[in-house]
Amino acid sequence: MTHPVISLKPSYNSVIRGCPGLPDTLPRIECQLRVRSNNSLPFKLVKIEIVLKTIEIYFNKNLYSSNNSSFTPFNRPSDPSNGHSDTSNQNISIHYKKNIVLSHPTHDGDDLNNDLIGIDIPLTIGLPDDIKETNYNPKFGKTQTFLDCTVFYTEVGGGSSNKKRNFLYPVNVERYTYLPSPSYFRPINRSNITSPDQKFLISYSIENPCVSMNNDTLKLSISIRLNPFPNNATTPSSNDFDVSTPTLFSTKKKFKSKLKLKSITTQILEYLEILKNQSEFSSTQTTNILQTSVRQVDQIISMNSMIFQFNLKIFTKDKILQSFRSSESSCPETKVLINKIDDIPLQYHSSITTIGQHFNVSHYLSIRFKFNKSLKNFEINHPLIISFWSVSQLPLIENLILQERQTAKFAKKFYKNFGRIKNTSNNNNSSNCLEYPSLPPIIYNFNDPETNNRFNILYSQKDPSRTDPSKLRRVPVIQ
């Protein structure tokens, strides 16, 4: 039975050109949609529907139990990819939708005017500025983008009822907005922050507030001392940053405290924020602790600052990949990866900072101070960004961005010959998206000598008129 076979041919190594997240690079999908007859016999093309969509799924809190093995998220029976609605919430964002219909017959005045054996359609689809990157977070959810192509057709001589064939192609989106470089994210310095009871002054600095998910180091410096003017304010305010430094002759009795700083605990946390309505995310956040580090201090706090330096190792890839970062000379244990979830490659299985239409995943650094008097304990939180890219990739990425910006200039000139690139607004949200002009397709007519020669289609001739397909038999050709 004759039916169309659908495939995609990327224009380059990837279907994505430009750098998603950087509008001046014209992030877009460039590929060729190929529709071919499965047996070189004709079919009638009705229309082709093309949809670009992003699917966001966040997991329920109790989706993963605490007794999961180290092989999670692989082969988990309760994974939402099996389609159970009780374990996930799903949102679909449509970025692009278009119906393609042949407006001119392929053979004028002939009964075979819609009989094809193939068609090639160049596709250029602009990616919206806020498109979400491909990611699988084992705790919170996953995000995927698909190019969904459906061909509606009828068989030649097989009646007028339409049939359809579908082709779903995953598009792995990587955003270039968060790069772990001082050029993009400068060091953070916070000075003279008062504790909730106004007894302490804390200063901290973060050298690299944007870190990589892949074995990066977060450099943190903390200093703490007694507040010389604890009664100047009853609640923390912006004036806390202007507290003057005490002199060497400060000998008031209230500073002769025996308060001990027992320990400093640092944690890397990830938060899940779910969209509550069209303009507001949920106020209640689901928290997950990625890693914890405790430093024992056990020292008396005085007017002199106590300074602590931290080098926190960051690795938020999936647990199954952590065994490959061992520096031991022994051969690591062999582990078999049986499958992957919904065709999401392993490099996207990690906890990174993402912003989407349905849910966000953000990260924070938590600094907890524990004293010998429990009422004095307090905590400081500071937002972090965990990037998909590693520090070693930065030179290559920066070079790629420069190349894509240059290519975008030539692309604008090219598409100007077929019309102009238009700015459009997505109907589902306020994101900006570019609409590219349509490029002419290549149509492969049935029984066309040039087409037969192109695809090495040879027939044993039983009908001299070559008009009855039932009397034609394809001769197999070994290539």
From Swiss-Prot:
Gene Ontology CC entries for this record: cellular bud neck; cytoplasm; division septum
Coiled coil: none
InterPro entries, per database record: Cytokinesis_Signaling_Reg
Chain residue ranges for the region called Disordered: 460-479
Domain of life: Eukaryota
Record-level GO BP terms: division septum assembly; protein localization to bud neck
Result of knocking out the encoding gene: Impairs the efficient localization of TUS1 to the bud neck at late anaphase.
Role according to the record: Regulator of RHO1 signaling that acts as a cofactor required for the efficient localization of the TUS1 GTP exchange factor (GEF) for RHO1 to the bud neck during all phases of cytokinesis. RHO1 is a key, essential hub protein in the cell wall integrity (CWI) pathway in which activated RHO1-GTP binds directly to and activates multiple different downstream effectors required for cell wall synthesis and actin assembly during cytokinesis.
Additional facts recorded: Present with 396 molecules/cell in log phase SD medium.
Name the record gives this protein: RHO1 GEF localizing protein 1
Organism: Saccharomyces cerevisiae (strain ATCC 204508 / S288c)
Gene symbol of the encoding locus: RGL1
